[in-house]
């Protein structure tokens, strides 16, 4: 529980993944994760705080770079909630293999890498060198529910036990 202690020390909490999946405001259909041997592939996650979408909007228009950075940190917390759901313990993470970050960007905005630093900085704070991923930071025009950031993460883990995924296979009514 070392990683979770670090989270608490930073004043951060993992969101309730099951609650987010039950709400499914986007109507998207997918599963939370899929494991192949000791590699955990995660679906894209977006920033939530206190159960609500956090820092929504277009970075470089509605939001500053700093607000986008903070949104990336909160999207990372959602990814880590999926890792904990799957593995039961964040300390089983051996390496964050890859992060792909999408930034809902205004025309001409070119600081996507600095926005997605919010993700990698948090991962390094929590996991040290194990949190240094390969990475892409991609600007896009529009994300579901006007989210500012979406993170896709791939993780190498220890042990063999993996909980089955949560499914978003319905439309919220």
Where are the regions that the model predicts?
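N-terminal presequence-like segments and the immediate start of the first folded domain
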Residues: 1-77, 81, 85-97, 105-173
């Amino acid at each position: 529980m070392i990683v979770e202690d670090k989270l608490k020390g930073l004043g951060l909490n993992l969101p309730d993944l099951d609650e987010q999946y039950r709400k499914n405001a986007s109507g998207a259909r997918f599963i939370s994760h899929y494991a192949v041997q000791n590699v955990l592939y995660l679906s894209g996650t977006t920033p939530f705080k206190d159960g609500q979408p956090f820092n929504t909007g277009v970075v470089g228009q509605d939001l500053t770079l700093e607000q986008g950075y903070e949104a990336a940190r909160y999207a990372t917390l959602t990814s880590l909630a999926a890792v904990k759901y799957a593995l039961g313990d964040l300390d089983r993470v051996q390496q964050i293999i890859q992060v792909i970050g999408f930034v809902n960007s205004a025309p001409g905005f070119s600081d996507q890498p600095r926005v997605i630093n919010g993700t990698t900085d948090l991962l390094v704070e929590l996991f040290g060198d194990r949190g240094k991923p390969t990475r892409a930071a991609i600007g896009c025009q529009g994300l579901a529910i006007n989210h500012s950031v979406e993170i896709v993460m791939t993780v190498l883990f220890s042990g063999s036990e993996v909980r089955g995924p949560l499914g978003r296979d319905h439309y919220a009514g």
